[in-house]
């Protein structure tokens, strides 16, 4: 017995340094992609400089967070002191972790009370934020609950019977639970608002002020956003105590995002989008429209062209929205068409291209849209399809943001948005398990039960797009007359998106992207061409450049107004 004890003592060694505990961590593969100064311009601090809880540090490192970003360096030490914070930083620079980490550090797991309330404007952002809380705090024994509208109250009421330390949700649902005295916020010391500018708009402000009445008077209030209108200052003066202001917006747009515009007639936009798909090397893309009807119509057209596509908007059933959000995050589909529902805070690092099929009306919406690419200092591409009515909005947005959106060139350098090893791009923090693949008809019925089958076109592609090579293209974005295929018209849509005066000259849809398994009326079979010759954009001065239906010169004046009526917005 004594010999065995002696052998064990010989085999036992004391810790040789403070870093030994890191050797047993389950660290993800390191992201070796290039990063811009948006996240690298730091003071050189480490997580250990302001976080001393080893269990929290384990969650931080296992989530792949190697060094704090500038907003995290500025906000976390102040938040730990309990002071109110007004923090403004660019999209995709780590604002979520900047308030989640200090909140986790200050929570006492032994106290069975709600100790932190995090408000977000959308349901998708609520789910994403709750997953960040769960992942970073997985070693702390902290319970996180997410609650949003669109679902029944029963599950939330049952869940709140058990200890909950952090509640993440949308304002209306939280107010409903607090008003019914189901959620006890009387001892909740932390009140956090992400995307605070949206939450303090006229739509949400009355709800926010009512929610504050359920909190103790000595609460800590923290506001985070990329844009702060005057409504934020009014709220701060009324409800915050000497807030510490952080402003890291030396410029408004992310440095890693390259912005272009293509001037194109409304009825030629689908042709232009088809060309972009076939020429650009897209890992994942988000395509924005200005209305829910146009979202569904465009998703239908994209699927008919032979590309995998999901769509999402606010009028969909919550279950369908959840499935689309999770599947797209996990790489099930390459392209997502959506309204402004997903412009706020959604973090999908595999997205390298954002396309504004409908140009936004204001600079704030534009800034949040293009911020879906180029996440956390990485590279991205934003392409805007501009018609004649958008020319003044383009000028105003350039002026308000202090940036210049260049005309799209014949050739786009791959180094601006393409990574050599897309399979190494990390997926967002998520514990979601992909839903088993269902037949096409079931998927259509789960998304829009009230629609007919012919109006539903969801792809059943299940292979993650970040493990597929980016769509290959020769980067020559103009139409190539020598590469024409036999002419075949694009299927007619429910709108004036098909040109009445001829079609552009192109090679049609590329076969490099995964194609859906079902096609309406036998359209879109592999190998078919969707090219055609046409005059594109024509002005008074004669025929213009046919790339993208004609690329216009100066944006504020010119003689090339499109002929004929544009389609209805």
Curated annotation (Swiss-Prot):
Residue ranges of the region described as Disordered: 1-39, 436-569
Positions annotated to bind ATP: 89-96
Compositionally biased region (Low complexity): 437-482, 543-569
Major location (coarse): cytoplasm
Sequence motif Q motif, residues: 45-73
Domain Helicase C-terminal: 256-416
Chain positions of motif DEAD box: 194-197
Family: Belongs to the DEAD box helicase family. DDX6/DHH1 subfamily.
This protein's domain notes: The Q motif is unique to and characteristic of the DEAD box family of RNA helicases and controls ATP binding and hydrolysis.
Protein name, per record: ATP-dependent RNA helicase dhh1
Organism from which the protein derives: Neurospora crassa (strain ATCC 24698 / 74-OR23-1A / CBS 708.71 / DSM 1257 / FGSC 987)
Lineage: Eukaryota, Fungi, Dikarya, Ascomycota, Pezizomycotina
Gene designation: drh-10
């Amino acid at each position: 017995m004594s010999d065995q004890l002696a052998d064990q003592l010989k085999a036992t060694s004391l810790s040789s340094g403070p870093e030994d505990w890191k050797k047993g961590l389950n660290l993800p593969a390191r992201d070796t992609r290039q990063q811009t100064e948006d996240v690298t311009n730091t003071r050189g601090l480490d997580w250990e400089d302001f976080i001393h809880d080893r269990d929290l540090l384990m969650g931080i490192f296992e989530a792949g967070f190697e060094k704090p970003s500038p907003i995290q360096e500025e906000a976390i030490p102040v938040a730990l002191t309990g002071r109110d914070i007004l923090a403004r930083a660019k999209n995709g620079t780590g604002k979520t972790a900047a308030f989640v980490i200090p909140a986790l550090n200050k929570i006492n797991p032994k106290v069975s009370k709600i100790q932190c309330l995090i408000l977000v404007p959308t349901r998708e952002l609520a789910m994403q934020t709750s997953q960040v809380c769960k992942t970073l705090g997985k070693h702390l024994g902290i319970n996180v609950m997410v609650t949003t509208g669109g679902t029944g109250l029963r599950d939330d009421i049952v869940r709140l019977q058990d200890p909950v330390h952090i509640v993440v949700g949308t304002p209306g649902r939280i107010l409903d639970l607090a008003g019914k005295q189901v959620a006890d916020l009387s001892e909740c010391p932390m009140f956090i608002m992400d995307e605070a500018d949206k939450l303090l708009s006229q739509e949400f402000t009355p709800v926010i002020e009512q929610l504050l009445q359920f909190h103790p008077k000595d609460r800590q209030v923290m506001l985070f956003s990329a844009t702060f209108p005057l409504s934020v200052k009014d709220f701060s003066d009324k409800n915050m105590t000497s807030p510490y202001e952080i402003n890291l917006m030396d410029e408004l747009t992310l440095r890693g995002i390259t912005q272009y515009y293509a001037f194109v007639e409304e009825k030629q936009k689908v042709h232009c989008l088809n060309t972009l798909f076939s020429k650009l090397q897209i890992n994942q893309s988000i395509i924005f429209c200005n209305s829910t009807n146009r979202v569904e119509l465009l998703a239908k057209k994209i699927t008919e062209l032979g590309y995998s596509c999901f769509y999402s908007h606010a009028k969909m059933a919550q279950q369908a929205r959840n499935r689309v959000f999770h599947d797209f995050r996990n790489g099930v589909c390459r392209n997502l068409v959506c309204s402004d529902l997903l412009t706020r805070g959604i973090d999908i690092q595999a997205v390298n291209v954002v396309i504004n099929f409908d140009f936004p009306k204001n600079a704030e919406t534009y800034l949040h849209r293009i911020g879906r690419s180029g996440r956390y200092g990485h590279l991205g591409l934003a392409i805007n399809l501009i018609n004649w009515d958008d020319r003044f909005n383009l000028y105003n947005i350039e002026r308000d943001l202090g940036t210049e959106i260049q005309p799209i060139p014949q050739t786009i350098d791959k180094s601006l948005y393409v990574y050599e090893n897309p399979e190494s791009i990390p997926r967002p923090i998520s514990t979601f398990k992909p839903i088993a693949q269902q037949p096409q008809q079931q998927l259509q019925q789960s998304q829009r039960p009230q629609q007919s089958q012919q109006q539903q076109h969801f792809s059943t592609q299940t292979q993650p797009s970040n493990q597929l090579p980016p769509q290959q293209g020769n980067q020559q974005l103009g139409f190539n007359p020598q590469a024409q295929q036999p002419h075949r018209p694009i299927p007619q849509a429910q709108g004036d998106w098909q040109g009445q005066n001829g079609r552009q000259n192109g090679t049609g849809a590329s076969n490099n992207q995964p194609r859906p398994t079902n096609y309406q009326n036998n359209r879109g079979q592999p190998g078919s061409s969707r090219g055609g010759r046409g005059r594109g954009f024509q002005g008074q001065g004669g025929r213009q450049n046919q790339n993208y239906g004609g690329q216009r010169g100066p944006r504020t004046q010119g003689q090339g107004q499109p002929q004929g009526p544009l389609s209805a917005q």
